[in-house]
Amino acid sequence: MNIEDAVKHLHIPHELNEFIGDYYKALVKRADIDLLGESEFRCFARFLEMYASSRYQFADKAMRRLFQFLHMLIYIDEDGKPRHLELYPVQKFIMCGIFGLRTPDGGYVVNTANLYMARRNGKSFLLSGVLHYLMGMSKFRNELIVLASCKGQNATICFNEFTKFIENDPYLAETFSNVNKTACWAKNKNTGNRLDMFRTGGGAKNSLDGYTNKVAVIDEEMLCDEIIPKTIQDGQAHFKDSLLVTMSTAQFSVGSDNHKKWLTLRKMLYEDALLDNVFLFLAEPNLEELQAKEFGQITTWGKANPVLLFEADGFTVKKHIKEKYAQKARAACTEKGFALQSFVTKQCNAWYSAEDRSLCSYDQLKDCGVDYGMEEVITKGYIDWYLGVDLSQTLDLSSVVLLCFVGESKTGKLLKKNSPAARHRLFMHVMSWMPENKLQAHIEKDKFSYTDYVGTELFLCNGAGGDNIDTPQIFEQLDTLRKCQVFLGNSFDCQ
């Protein structure tokens, strides 16, 4: 797709110009300098198509009130001066995408909004503004608003931004009956809406179970267990009007459920298959740029930074940001490994896992396979083994890897220990343990026939009636193996 031509063929209705006209101008300018990605363009074009369909109305009065309200919010700038919040053109569009389109009876069209862009693009800052609108200005009344966050010690970042607006404005503070910064909750006395923050780790699902909340916001969704959004939406399912807003940046867990969700949303965007009640904003490099791994080019990482890279007009490139991040990009591309992984995921908003050249790939590992097993190795006299043990307390799998050096002939035949050998190689045997009651669930979820390995490489635990890993059972099995096969553990590493 020629983005530069396609964006110029879009038509902005006159009645929408005051709300998204600046964003459209920014898109045209960014396309001219190759800093507009196809995904972001498609998100905007889809919004225009939905409006043009005449199925929905645009709530111009409500959106004017929303922008007027957000403009009244006060923040402290880098120089320590109080300033009223000014939204970037792209942020105005996001607000219109979430709240602007209404059904004929006045209800919100969107009940799920997914916002994906690079780090340092004001996502948490914007969400804190969204929370203030939801708490005090939206149509919701006496509702529980869930803020789910999962960034470890930074879990309160969005809530802190929320409370800073209150601290900076005594008039806004008067609208709250209580703000508890320690327990992370607040209540608006005008609407009765209450905001509660949950950290999505450990027993978060249990904490959220049973909540029948209409409104929820998730900060850094792609760091959450995928069950968290599902649990929240379960609590919203029976409401006619509900809203879930999530924001995130790409991660490095390629192939995970969250990654699959990301890919599915993108695929549906490109196939025009997204439901009308889903608003997606996705700022990322184009596919061909990712495939070419041109991560050091500003025309790659710049497409994922619609706020960070530009001045308030949304298209004039900030010189100091361009220079700073160009330097970061060059350094990451030179260093590779985890440095490149960090830059690609955080600033290119692309899913990427570091390639460690000291490790082989899965296919290379398969090519190292031999036609003899552990029992034959022991029979040949190899009884000195290294054991690496990973005992899991939270996951459904514990594993032990057994390693020893063996000798082979030129044709790859296993030789007896201490025989003259053409080469020596590292023989590896892996044993894993899984709770008995979790086997079928993993077969269905992972689409992998674990049953083919039960009793040989995979052993089932009956701890807690088959629901948990039974560590003593693992040690007993290893001890039995030691006694029967007469092997010695030279190195035993419990991690």
Task: Please annotate each region the language model reported.
Residues L365, S432-M434, Q495:
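Active/binding-pocket-proximal capping segment
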Residues L391-Q393:
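Non-cytosolic beta-sheet module surface loops
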Residues F159, N213, P229-Q233, D257-T264, ...:
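Composition- and surface-driven signal marking solvent-exposed, interaction-prone regions
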Residues N121, N490-Q495:
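Acidic, metal-coordinating catalytic cores used for nucleic-acid/nucleotide bond scission
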Residues K187-T191, C404-L488:
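Nucleic-acid-processing active sites and adjacent nucleic-acid-binding tracks
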Residues N2-V389, T480-C484:
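Phosphate/NTP-binding elements of NTP-utilizing enzymes
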Residues S128-G136, L395-T411:
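Acidic, metal-ligating active-site segments
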